[in-house]
């Protein structure tokens, strides 16, 4: 070839290479040209199951790739990265047939914590309007999710790297999938697992500890839509598992119906977004916890205080997961929800022939929290657990009020004002092994219905 013919072609080739980086890494998949989102459904859309798998990765954290699970190598041609852990999000029953408002916040919260594959299982078509039909679809859905996970494993993912996060009915779908894998998946998190049709179901039909190497569940609506029985290695009962603070009154009917139930989801999102720990305390019941009978991270079933979130096994050593454990914690009305817990105690100098009720309030830099404790008849000690939004050392003041006794007052008889004398002590949880509490330096005299204010100066 003559030099004058070669030069223009070489120049053209160089320009082409500059403008078109020929297959810039053959295995690299760019941001999808089309972003897929949830299907929409309605009460008139029927109950036929139609499942979409939406993939989000560090390469496309805001843009869902629709994976056709029936197409050979569809996952392999996507942005899926088998070297990363995989979070599989499964929603539950839908009344309206629209995308859950919590879906995007949960996806983004996961990406802020770690590089991960996020797969959203959209079964809006098949979960809308008719709850019983949605329940009937669970086994079929579980089989499809199982087949999808097997494709991930074929690409090199490990069973232990799979974490299913299921909300309401989605928690039991996760249980069905985990059962198909013989409990070898890494983790299943149930966000207020659904109650109806599952409370009396067999372990194979619902979420249970045998479904994964670690199963945790968050209970927030156990007196309504959420299941009350423990279903995991660790079960968190938030504010006793029902009646969440900040949820609206029955006047706002729809929000009233779903607020407690969805609080588990928003608590989980908050645990990923905020550093303050949502720590649970092992105890036999919420009543025993609030009464101040479970002050440390030790019980017959558990020797740790697990935390909601992505911490491995909730921070619990593997050897402690041989039996199911229930843990309890209180929260605030809004994100980040986390509170500090302290035990408060009043010790009477002299026992009384009637029960004694004392309101104890903490005043911090901004907010105020209070509880009422009871000293039983002929007893001398009353205690309880009080939640507060700042550490105990930042609580400036304690206010104690002796509550009035109920009595019938005769018109011809004078009424004597009641008074007691005793000692006030407190300690932030978990309590120290020494059992030593901080006590005010002097005894207090409380007069009925008269608030007594005292500075509270504990060390940070």
Language model features with spans:
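Alpha/beta-hydrolase active-site loop signature
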Residues: 125-127, 195
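Short, well-ordered amphipathic alpha-helical segments that serve as non-catalytic structural scaffolds
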Residues: 144-149, 215
